[in-house]
């Protein structure tokens, strides 16, 4: 089937004309702006009920080892905004691309170019024109300031106001007094044994409404509630603070040479060329070797987790068939920021219902498409390259599936 016809057939599946126009515009924009990659979604590591871990370091490592991927990296997970850096020999020609494939144009160009100076200086540029580098744009507030203020800070303030009111009022004391009264206890006992009609015959309607409200009201453990709010605020202060723009690069995707030839790097160890942060690199001979080495990996992660989001687990080889790019293992303190102040109180419930199957499938598919996008020569990205446009379309359609998943995963 002709590739252009395939694009049309796929587009027919999009029901709204407005959506078709937007998607066509996005695809054309990809080509016009020379976007060579499209970030994948990253799945959390599998849970471990036995270890009481919602995102299990052990299970994430074991998942790869069980599938024959024995050379793995464990790196710090940075809490910012994902971006691809198109780093040019002439630094001022460089540009940034967001997670969804949009050129980032609304940041202060002078500031972010200055923040790339050290990264640029790490390389010899003899014979190389461009390097495409995966990175985290830091801090989170650089792109997420509005989200932080409107959602996370507002959420914290609402809970703090609620806690302050409960501590300062006598509401809980009054409810406790009512619950201790003999007549209330008699009502509760009757409500368990009498039919609805019998209960109405015995008690006036206003008494039934009052006692049912008192019975059904959940009283918070105020010391625990305030502790959870404080934890949420601590995490918000750590990750939501404002600071000058900087980058945490973590993988070189490919290099474009002056003569147009390209090097598809495909090696997560490129991290050490572009980042001085400590990371782990292990090769496991077999299952017993993994079990023997796991405690030292666990100890390193526990030490590193203080005031951080967590870690990512990656194969040494970046692109492997039917494999995700990474698993993320976020710690419980950070997950309080994502799931809310009662996350740790409801941890067992969250573990029981956690299901990463859909997220993992999307991650594997996204990464496979990204490999094909990157294998398209940079010089061949233009509006007449229908094979490339078809890959972009596949990836955009994949977003619709991802949008149906729990956004907190």
PLM segments and residue spans:
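Low-complexity, highly charged intrinsically disordered N-terminal segments
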Residues: 10-58, 82
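Conserved loop->alpha-helix
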Residues: 95-141, 172
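Core catalytic machinery and nucleic-acid-binding channels of phosphodiester-processing enzymes
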Residues: 85, 127-129, 134-146, 150, ...
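Eukaryote-specific, cytoplasm-facing alpha-helical/coiled-coil scaffolding segments in long proteins
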Residues: 158-165, 360-366
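Generic structural signal of hydrophobic/aromatic residues within well-ordered alpha-helices
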Residues: 23-26, 60, 64, 112-122, ...
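Nucleic-acid 5′ end/cap handling module spanning
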Residues: 54-103, 146, 180, 184-409
